[in-house]
Amino acid sequence: MTQPDTLTVDLSLLQSVLAKYAGRRREALLPLLHEAQALYGWLPREVQEAIGETLRVPLADIHGVVEFYSMFYNEPMARKVVRVCMDPACHMAGGAAVQLAIQERLGLKPGEADMEADIAYELVPCLGMCEHAPNALLGDRPAGDLTPADVDAFLAGVYPEPEPKIYGGPFIKLTRAGRVDPTSLADFEKYGGYDGLRNVMTMSPEEIIVQLKGSDVLGRGGAMFPVGLKWEMARQAPGEPSEKHIVANADESEPGTFKDRALMEQDPFSLIEAMTVAAYTVGASNGWIFLRGEYPRCEKRLRNAIDKARAAGYLGHNILGRKGFNFDIELRLGAGAYICGEETALFEAIEGKRGFPRIKPPYPTTHGLFNQPTVVNNVETLAAALSVIGMGVNQWRKLGTVDSPGTKWFCISGRVLRPGVYEVPFGLTIRQLVQLAGGQIGDEIQAVLVGGAAGVFVGPDQLDIPLTYEDAKAHNFPLGSGVIMVFDEAVDLHEIMYMLSRFFAHESCGKCYPCQLGTQRQMEILERITYHGGPQPSDRADLVDMGLTMTETSLCGLGQTAATAILSAIALWPELVQPAGRVNGRLR
């Protein structure tokens, strides 16, 4: 931690902020760091010391947390940061030209800051706006569909903010999106908001769990764990725990994933209602939304929704007049660490620590947040549970297939004419989804990435596979977070593979060696293949060996899936990593 010897830090600016946190402990560290950095633009040693004294956290621990999260700064930094996406969807949409235009306009290279102008420039992983590629953030102002001609307006802060693009149907979980004012509780109520909560309060928790089990709703974040079973396990947690928690995992950070942002921006009250229903069912009194730091509009709308729900009696003590039904929600903002999407790393982050994953067992339903019973669900999963309660099991099961009932949100991006979030029943094929998105831009589809950066590539001969849990299992590919990223014949797959490997090397927390070393070496090999001379004879064997080692020995899901897409590409197109293979990573 270095800073100029002559720098004077005015701690009087911090006193009113520290006063709000008097009596709090380490669990308040992340929000306090965010508030302090908003004052100073960075986190000087003196500020960290004052925070440590307030929360009773050692300076070394605070420094470790600041170093862990990419959006916190230990050294002087400009207050306004331009963050430009450098991942596949933006790359395919002309992101490099936008990056160059911003560099020339600012006179900065990536990672540099103009302290006099108080502005910095960074290239960052996916910002979760892939339907608006290329995209960027100017401080807390998002912008999408950028071209070099838009850069002046973007940097001036007058370029329009993008709205989620939502398509498909029938709309079940996104039925209000685009139809209501997302800042208005009255509008939400007018279109059926909180009818679900009132309905469940006429039922016993056991009856709700029976409904969820009958619906076969599985986790929508990738793990596919049955929701009814998870809620039941937390409700029945042994030992009469004093507190239970509901956690919404809104740390949506995987390249190509942007579905949860659509709900949080367009219908934020529904997430609050769904969490409250979960709390009633499980017997929880504490709710937490862990939101990625790069979603500023979601943050504003969720805070507004929480405040208005609390003021109207939908949160707090004796909710809707029910004595003893006490539940409240706190929004926690992340700071740029994909690993915090792993549920136990998320717990560590909320508790004010570095986001290292925990060893399991024990599992969250008995030993989760603060070592207490916890239900942690993805945003779409909570929306699905609320939908089942609202429409009933029989109506829910009329959609989709027998083994995959209901609807799913798919994030369609890349080389298609109409990228966006598509809510559709389970059972459509990959080809049908691509056609729904207007079809591919080029003459033919070269490949599709299914399930996200941690998913798999499929070739043109696999486009007629239905998107269901049973078909995904039969064909050995994950639905994951619902990513469908399309690559036509113009795309260099070498570049895409390198970008995926770069993402995981950047996001590995470093706790376990297989992931820490494997992701770095995987990236190095693919960078050389793509940009510095092409494949060597040993590359295929080395990549497969490293990939399998990471898959089998890494501690958490990040390392276990960091090579999944790469291994699938090698299996389909071994010539990509062999000498005299594909020309420029494209089909011959």
Mark where each language-model region is:
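Ferredoxin-type iron-sulfur electron-transfer modules in oxidoreductases and energy-metabolism complexes
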Residues: 2-82, 86-165, 195-214, 242-245, ...
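Histidine-anchored nucleotide/phosphate-binding helix
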Residues: 69, 267-281
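Short strand-turn-strand beta-turns centered on an Asx-Gly dipeptide
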Residues: 138-141, 413, 417-419, 450-451
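Flexible inter-domain linker/hinge segments
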Residues: 158-214, 377-392
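Gly-rich Lys/Arg/Thr-decorated short loops/hinges at beta-loop-alpha junctions or inter-strand turns
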Residues: 180-183, 188-195, 246-260, 364-370, ...
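Accessory "access/gating" subregions that flank catalytic or transport cores
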Residues: 198-239, 398, 423, 449-474
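Short amphipathic, charge-patterned alpha-helical segments
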Residues: 274-278, 425-442
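Hydrophobic alpha-helical positions that pack around
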Residues: 299-426, 440
